[in-house]
Amino acid sequence: MQLKNPILGLCQQATFMLSAAKVDQCPDDEGFEVAFAGRSNAGKSSALNTLTHASLARTSKTPGRTQLLNFFGLDEDRRLVDLPGYGYAKVPIPLKLHWQRHLEAYLGSRESLKGLILMMDIRHPMTDFDVLMLDWAIASNMPMHILLTKADKLTYGAAKNTLLKVQAEIRKGWGDAVSIQLFSAPKRMGLEEAYTVLADWMELEDKAPAE
């Protein structure tokens, strides 16, 4: 069945806008933005590329290469933002602190930010970085949706069990405000669910047909 969610067409026409090292280099703070965050090597760039059907986000065998806020335009009012990857051991500490400082500035000041997509490697979920992002989202009343990436690396049963376990842990620690799903970029698993979240946050009517 062909997905008719209106966000699909917008994602397919996504174009690179600019890279920002600091908040004052970001596009005008208006419209709708959804940011993608994740610990290094969590599959963030691959997820973005799969959702947009393009090679917009840079992928690398060396985690942590994304050092800037990268903005991708969907239309005049809507953008996706690729946030810096964190946690890679070979990144110098001063650079890590620089990334952290500007990430906090972006998250804390951006009025157009409507939601945060957090990538977790399903084999290594709930890292310290993930917990920090969850804490921030709840404290800031920011909608968050989690993609348990690389779900194809596990059997379906093991992936489902991990989903339920992480879901229970999040509900216990942070309540029901955070949604979560399985995702695999190579297998294109979970695209419909992710598109529906994006459409909701960007105030696009969900026209996906009912089951």
Curated annotation (Swiss-Prot):
Transmembrane portions of the chain: none
GO MF assignments: GTP binding; metal ion binding
Keyword Cell division appears in the UniProt entry: yes
EngB-type G domain sequence ranges: 30-204
GO biological process, one term: division septum assembly
Cofactors demanded by this protein: Mg(2+)
UniProt keyword terms in alphabetical order: Cell cycle, Cell division, GTP-binding, Magnesium, Metal-binding, Nucleotide-binding, Septation
Superkingdom, natural source: Bacteria
GO cellular component: cytosol
Annotated GTP binding sites: 38-45, 64-68, 82-85, 149-152, 182-185
PROSITE patterns noted in UniProt: G_ENGB (PS51706)
Pfam families from the UniProt entry: MMR_HSR1
Entry annotated with the keyword Metal-binding: yes
Positions bound to Mg(2+): S45, T66
Family stated for the protein in its record: Belongs to the TRAFAC class TrmE-Era-EngA-EngB-Septin-like GTPase superfamily. EngB GTPase family.
Described purpose of this protein according to its UniProt entry: Necessary for normal cell division and for the maintenance of normal septation.
PANTHER family per record: ENGB-TYPE G DOMAIN-CONTAINING PROTEIN, MSS1/TRME-RELATED GTP-BINDING PROTEIN
Record-given protein name: Probable GTP-binding protein EngB
Originating species: Pseudomonas syringae pv. syringae (strain B728a)
